[in-house]
Curated annotation (Swiss-Prot):
Binds 2 Mg(2+) ion per subunit. Mg(2+) 1 binds at residues 7, 139. Its main location: cytoplasm. It comes from Trichlorobacter lovleyi (strain ATCC BAA-1151 / DSM 17278 / SZ). Keywords: Cytoplasm, DNA damage, DNA recombination, DNA repair, DNA-binding, Endonuclease, Hydrolase, Magnesium, Metal-binding, Nuclease. It is found in: Cytoplasm. This is Crossover junction endodeoxyribonuclease RuvC. One of its GO terms (biological process) is DNA recombination.
Length: 178
């Protein structure tokens, strides 16, 4: 299974591709889509959509996992983050891919084993799990963690059987039709 993980942001949207080979996780690529804050916001959303569409076309993932919006006291920032997530989800749905969403604490739990783990702990574990010396961009590292979270969660759902699969906490946009 090949998964594209996405850490959405209105300025920087990180992405990471991880593939599962048996019990091994293999890092394929990671990076970020950068937008220019001087541009108008709809144009920045277009850049996110187009950038992720290129990544999807190049790597042909089987699924996309997106970090869910966290609660923010800054309503304007939360709305912009939600719109950036929408652009990312639209790119995946446009390509016909299933989309799964995970909260930050679900990602941390799946990667580190603790839902309140710090960013540094997550980055360290991502590097250890994939045998990487470094991941240059923090947003890309977070996106790789989201991909790992989906692979681990997917495997657990398969092992647990249909009862868990129907009551999963991660939501899917697979059946969404505008």
């Amino acid at each position: 299974m090949r998964v594209l993980g996405i850490d959405p942001g209105s300025r920087i949207t990180g992405y990471g591709l991880v593939e599962q080979h048996g019990s091994r996780l293999v890092h394929l690529d990671n990076g970020a889509v950068f937008t220019d804050k001087a541009k108008d916001f709809p144009d920045r959303l277009r850049l996110i959509f187009e950038g992720l569409s290129r990544v999807i076309a190049e790597y042909a993932p089987d699924a996309v996992a997106v970090e869910d919006v966290y609660v923010s006291e800054n309503v304007r920032a939360a709305l912009k983050l939600g719109q950036a997530r929408g652009a990312a989800i639209a790119a995946a749905v446009h390509a016909g891919l299933p989309v799964f969403e995970y909260t930050a604490s679900q990602v941390k739990q799946a990667v580190v084993g603790q839902g309140r783990a710090g960013k540094e702990q997550v980055q360290k574990m991502v590097k250890a799990l994939l045998g990487l010396p470094e991941i240059a961009q923090a947003d890309a590292s977070d996106a790789v963690a989201v991909a790992i979270c989906h692979i681990n969660s997917y495997q657990l759902r398969l092992q647990a059987g249909p009862a868990v699969a129907t009551s999963r906490r991660a939501s899917s946009w697979r059946n969404y039709r505008p």
